[in-house]
From Swiss-Prot:
PANTHER family for the chain: 1-D-DEOXYXYLULOSE 5-PHOSPHATE SYNTHASE-RELATED, 1-DEOXY-D-XYLULOSE-5-PHOSPHATE SYNTHASE, CHLOROPLASTIC
Family matches, as PROSITE patterns: TRANSKETOLASE_1, TRANSKETOLASE_2
GO biological process: 1-deoxy-D-xylulose 5-phosphate biosynthetic process; glyceraldehyde-3-phosphate metabolic process; terpenoid biosynthetic process; thiamine biosynthetic process
Enzyme class: transferase
Gene for this chain: dxs
Main function: Catalyzes the acyloin condensation reaction between C atoms 2 and 3 of pyruvate and glyceraldehyde 3-phosphate to yield 1-deoxy-D-xylulose-5-phosphate (DXP).
Enzyme Commission (EC) number: 2.2.1.7
Keyword tags: Isoprene biosynthesis, Magnesium, Metal-binding, Thiamine biosynthesis, Thiamine pyrophosphate, Transferase
Bilayer-spanning residue ranges: none
Domain of life: Bacteria
UniProt source species: Rhizobium etli (strain CIAT 652)
Binding site for Mg(2+): D151, N180
Listed name of the protein: 1-deoxy-D-xylulose-5-phosphate synthase
Matching InterPro entries: Dxylulose-5-P_synthase, THDP-binding, Transketo_C/PFOR_II, Transketolase-like_Pyr-bd, Transketolase_BS, Transketolase_C, Transketolase_CS
Binding positions (thiamine diphosphate): H79, A120, H121, S122, G152, A153, N180, Y289, E371
Length: 638
């Protein structure tokens, strides 16, 4: 383990007010020290490295020029917020990032007044910033609002909806487009810096304002013509863009690692801008740390790593990950069925669809951060007889719920939804937890909703989804490795709406939906040791429910517990609805539903989160004993 870096200048900066006391010539040294501090911290905690390293100069420049927190600074997604946290009173806790009771890996309103808006999902910053800018106008307050958004987040329609609205409202909003994909040639040399300063200065902005005042007297048609003439005239020097067509004053691109470029432009915009401004800043992911510069994709999100070599800590898995099992099973099926296609929303590696893209590049589509489009795109493919697998994280499927309902479910189109990161996800906290998919999908008529109990079951569900053409079908599975069961050479086609008995008993029935099955089996051992004969069943389906299985468990056991790593309103609620409608609660059946608690659970290790929720072995046993009026006198086996 390396020693923390020496940071004499950073040691003088606790809050941005301290930063604003520094001379401009000191800022490059401060940037080096912030980078060193961030690299050391993330090497100890893991987290998002590349994005933060890429915005060190930009973050320092913004806090140097603007009066934060009175001026509002909003980061889109939040992957790049670590330098911001270091400079806003949280450096003393930066080595608790993403740990239980530690700093969030994203911006969070409850954490600091310097985080005016929380983030973790993409493309929300401009909308939130516009709301704050309009609030400032209504309050007759001259505070500035700055939204920093990456080029990747600009692939989502919500960002353009906000830009369009901001332009129409002529809002006092500053949008900084952080272009770290190098998709647009980076600016170089003094001429680029000069043009950016010129375009952000009083003369050019005054020319634009004069045009606006003139057209106020001449009607809408003349207004549009003169406004476009002004922007196009400026475009000959600075480059015209679609942002100008939306009503934004566009500046850049400028070098996001040069204070000589950043400071004068930001100061000009601060002092002169009266309407919406977009500053195009080009940065490099991983800037200042050679391993991250050389492999930006591998250093976007990292485990703990060696600062000297860049080597990341890897724990040898005991079993393959659920994501890899899904990917391999899908590739296997795709080799046998050329109607199978894969769709991902900017997460090919995270969802495992990169494996499908390698094997069948023409049948795998990365649509960018555009979940709504992804789902309706899949619906169009399904309408033409293809078998689309729209692989999304549970938390991101939420972004496309209307499309799931309107474009897929109502039309009964056979779109397949592999739902990754179901349940607790650990360090990313409540914004990324896969809590709600079972609840919001199982309410939809005609939807088939499955959950894999282990990696072999997941393989069965992939093949089942391939074979099912009667309507939409989903299957959920968690982050991380499987439980180590024997794997079939190929998955089996499951009977729709049928679960399975895993262990027979007579007094207590544990009905699991998903990967809590392993803990149910362990809990059954402890209950048997306490003299309570226990049945364990794997539901497999939340919709359609296995009515025969549920009736059998209800009629032949004193107690029934449903167990799921999902929210209130999910599988357990579906079971309860069926039991009540069939009168199966009328004869004194004791029933309990174990779910994720109805709170926003903070980051921790998934096993700790399951224990807190009562979804682990000990929690299940404790629930049984309490329901039966017995003290927990028998120790739970370790």
């Amino acid at each position: 383990m390396t020693h923390p870096p020496k940071t004499p200048l950073l040691d003088q900066v606790i809050y941005p007010a301290d930063l604003r006391k520094l001379e401009d010539r000191d800022l490059p040294q401060l940037a080096r020290e912030v980078r060193d501090e961030m690299i050391d911290a993330v090497s100890r905690t893991g987290g998002h490295l590349g994005a933060g390293l890429g915005v060190v100069e930009l973050t320092i420049a913004i806090h140097s020029v603007f009066d934060t927190p009175d001026d509002r600074l909003i980061f889109d997604v939040g992957h790049q917020c670590y330098p911001h946290k270091i400079l806003t009173g949280r450096r003393d806790r930066i080595r608790t990032l993403r740990q239980e009771n530690g700093l969030s890996g994203f911006t969070r309103r409850a954490e600091s007044e310097y985080d005016p808006f929380g983030a973790a999902h993409s493309s929300t910053s401009i909308s939130a910033g516009l709301g704050m800018a309009i609030a400032a106008d209504l309050d007759k307050n001259d505070r500035r609002v700055i939204a920093v958004i990456g080029d990747g987040a600009m692939s989502a329609g919500m960002a353009y909806e906000a830009l369009n609205n901001a332009g129409a409202l002529d809002a006092r909003l500053i949008v900084i487009l952080n272009d770290n994909d190098m998709s647009i040639a980076p600016p170089t040399g003094a001429m680029s810096a000069y043009l950016a300063r010129l375009a952000s200065g009083r003369t050019y902005m005054g020319f634009r304002d004069f045009g606006k005042k003139l057209t106020a007297y001449l009607g809408k048609n003349i207004d549009r013509a003169i406004t476009r003439a002004v922007e196009h005239a400026r475009g000959y020097v600075t480059g015209g863009t679609m942002f100008e067509e939306m009503g934004f004053y566009h500046i850049g691109p400028i070098d996001g690692h040069s204070f000589d470029h950043l400071l004068p432009v930001l100061r000009n915009v601060r002092d002169n801008a009266r309407g919406p401004v977009l500053i195009h800043v080009v940065t490099q992911k991983g800037k200042g740390y050679p391993p991250a510069e050389a492999a930006a994709d591998k250093y976007h999100g990292v485990n703990k790593f060696d600062v000297i070599t860049g080597a990341q800590a890897r724990v040898k898995p005991n079993a393959p990950s659920y994501t890899s099992v899904f990917a391999e099973a899908l590739v296997q099926e795709a080799a046998l069925d050329d109607k199978i296609v894969g769709i991902t929303a900017a997460m090919p590696n995270g969802t495992g669809l990169d494996k499908l893209a390698e094997a069948f590049p023409s049948r795998c589509f990365d649509v960018g951060i555009a979940e709504q489009h992804a789902v309706t795109f899949a619906a169009g493919l399904a309408a033409e007889g293809y078998k689309p697998f729209a692989a999304l994280y549970s938390t991101f499927l939420q972004r496309a719920y209307d499309q799931v309902v309107h474009d897929v479910a109502i039309q009964g189109l056979p779109v397949r939804f592999p739902i990754d990161r179901a349940g607790f996800v650990g360090a990313d906290g409540p914004t990324h937890a896969g809590s709600f998919d079972t609840a919001f999908l199982a309410t939809l008529p005609g939807f088939v909703v499955m959950a894999a109990a282990d990696e072999a079951e997941l393989k069965h569900m992939v093949r089942t989804a391939v074979a099912y053409d009667a309507g939409p079908i989903s299957f959920r599975y968690p982050r991380g490795e499987g439980v180590g069961v024997d794997m079939p050479a190929r998955g089996e086609i499951l009977q729709i709406g049928k679960g399975r008995i895993v262990k027979e008993g007579t007094k207590v029935a544990l009905l699991s939906f998903g990967t809590r099955l392993a803990d149910c089996l362990l809990a059954a051992e402890d209950l048997e040791a306490a003299g309570l004969s226990t049945t364990v069943a794997d539901a497999r389906f939340a919709k359609p429910l296995d009515h025969d299985l549920i009736r059998q468990l209800a009629r032949h056991h004193e107690m029934l517990i449903t167990v799921e790593e999902g929210s209130v309103g999910g599988f357990g609620s579906q079971v309860m609805q069926y039991l009540s409608s069939e009168g199966l609660l009328d004869n004194g059946l004791k029933i309990r539903s174990l779910v994720m608690p109805d709170i926003w659970m903070e980051q921790a290790k998934p096993e700790a989160m399951n224990a807190h929720a009562g979804l682990d072995r000990a929690g299940i046993v404790s629930t049984v004993f309490r329901a039966l009026g017995r003290g927990v006198a028998v120790g739970v086996a370790g």
